[in-house]
Design a protein with these regions (language model features):
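Transmembrane alpha-helix boundary/anchor motif
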Residues: 24-25, 33, 37, 98, ...
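Membrane-interface loops
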Residues: 37, 72-75, 79-153, 161
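Membrane-water interface at transmembrane helix exits
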Residues: 26-27, 43, 104-108, 112, ...
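Short helix-capping/hinge motifs at transmembrane helix termini and TM-loop junctions
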Residues: 30-34, 66, 84-85, 111-112, ...
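Membrane-embedded catalytic cores of phosphoryl/pyrophosphoryl-handling enzymes
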Residues: 2-3, 119-224
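N-terminal transmembrane-helix/juxtamembrane module of multi-pass inner/ER membrane proteins
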Residues: 1-69, 109-119
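N-terminal export and membrane-targeting signals
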Residues: 2-16, 87-92, 152-159
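Alpha-helical transmembrane segments of multi-pass membrane proteins, especially transporters
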Residues: 44, 92-97, 157, 186-187
Length: 224
């Protein structure tokens, strides 16, 4: 279990660093044109391969990242953790939700990036980063952590959940409601927060706290 939570922590750190790099690339005037060039090409490609059944599928995927799906699942997960009295996982899950939701609005307002043209769905907020991608990743990965015990099986499903969240985020680009860089950034931040908080809490509970208690006990014994 120790190896798995540290591996998840390293994965979370890489994802968060990737998200920060994307934030910098979009913010920096010297690199934004290159990012936009990739985004424009991706958007044109998505528009060129639109096919009604695929649009329906993309809309279904996009729905999974919305509040009407995300929040009931989150509340159910928190109830399960509370019933099990798993306060460490509950605290980590709540912090992942709070920090991710706290990022979305300010970042969108800061970047004030317009949505792509030819969007299929109506949207009112700015484009960058994708709130659906962040929220979907936090929920998908968080549910795996809630429902499965620590171990190699959970780690495997965490990776699958991260991939699923990424596909769900990419569906937003097929509908032209987000640029590619929007959803890549959102997915990286969401996965990083969803994996990072539980890994940090488990490190403190299983490693740091026992070491601190052992040192405290040794110091007390040395004084007697």
């Amino acid at each position: 279990m120790l190896v798995n939570h540290r591996r998840a922590g390293r994965f979370a750190l890489v994802a968060l660093l990737g998200g920060v790099v994307m934030l910098a690339l979009v913010a920096w005037p010297a690199t934004l044109p290159a990012v936009q060039w990739v985004d424009d090409g991706w958007n044109r490609a998505m528009v060129s391969i639109r096919f009604t059944p695929f649009v329906w599928l993309a809309e279904a995927f996009a729905l999974l990242g919305g509040i009407w799906i995300n929040w009931p699942l989150r509340v159910a997960a928190m109830v399960i953790l509370a019933v099990r009295r798993n306060w460490v996982q509950l605290g980590a899950f709540v912090l992942a939700i709070v920090t991710s939701e706290a990022l979305i609005g300010p970042l969108k307002a800061l970047y004030a990036r317009p949505r792509p043209p030819q969007a299929i769905l109506e949207t009112s907020s700015y484009s960058f980063p994708s709130g659906h991608a962040i929220a979907g990743a936090v929920t998908a990965v968080g549910l795996v952590i809630v429902l499965l015990p620590p171990g190699s099986r959970r780690w495997s499903w965490e990776v699958k959940a991260a991939i699923f969240a990424s596909l769900m985020a990419l569906s937003r680009t097929y509908l032209s409601v987000h640029w590619l860089s929007d959803v890549v950034t959102g997915a990286l931040l969401g996965v990083g927060l969803a994996l990072g908080w539980p890994a940090l809490f488990q490190e403190v509970r299983d490693v740091r706290l026992p070491r601190w208690r052992a040192r405290k006990a040794a110091a007390a014994e040395a004084e007697t």
